[in-house]
């Protein structure tokens, strides 16, 4: 990864670490943090709110970013592998790592978004998380915008990431 990250730094390119299977989550988080500590590049990581560990994972990234003075982007998503994670865990006799009800995933998403918003860096030299919401859920987007206003951050402190062609009316309303 070093050559890629050094080239990204040289060209001012953000490298986003994606989050896939639960089994690789801790390895992905650790690799992300170690790479960020070794090389100063524009860094981002996807984090999944459908994981029961979502709140702890958010706290881990926030604490690390503050302690190291590192600014990183978190692309907060609900998660896309619910069926796989559920079936795989049940087949192996393991606890299921994802929330079983959508309302629990939604609640975790909103808690994580609040935590990341509260850790938004206020200066260039301060560590913290810049939040990018990967969601088409109007309630979750509205809750994040309301939290921004509550803590006195401008709307520009939040990036909304939506799939092209999905929910164009919501996209328009959220951008206003």
Predicted regions and their residues:
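Positively charged, amphipathic and often flexible ligand-engagement surfaces
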Residues: 1-176
């Amino acid at each position: 990864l070093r050559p890629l990250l050094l080239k990204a730094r040289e060209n001012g390119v953000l490298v986003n670490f994606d989050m896939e299977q639960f089994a690789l989550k801790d390895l992905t988080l650790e690799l992300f943090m170690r790479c960020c500590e070794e090389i100063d590049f524009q860094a981002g990581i996807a984090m999944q709110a459908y994981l029961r560990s979502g709140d702890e994972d958010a706290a881990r990234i926030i604490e690390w970013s503050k302690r190291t003075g590192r600014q990183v982007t978190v692309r907060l998503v609900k998660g896309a592998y619910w069926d796989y994670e559920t079936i795989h865990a049940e087949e192996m006799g393991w606890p299921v790592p994802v929330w079983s009800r959508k309302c629990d995933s939604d609640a975790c998403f909103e808690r994580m978004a609040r935590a990341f918003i509260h850790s938004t860096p206020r200066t260039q030299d301060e560590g913290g998380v810049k939040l990018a919401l990967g969601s088409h859920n109007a309630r979750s987007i509205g809750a994040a915008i309301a939290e921004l206003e509550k803590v006195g951050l401008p709307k520009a402190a939040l990036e909304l990431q939506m799939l092209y062609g999905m929910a164009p009316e919501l996209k328009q309303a959220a951008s206003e």
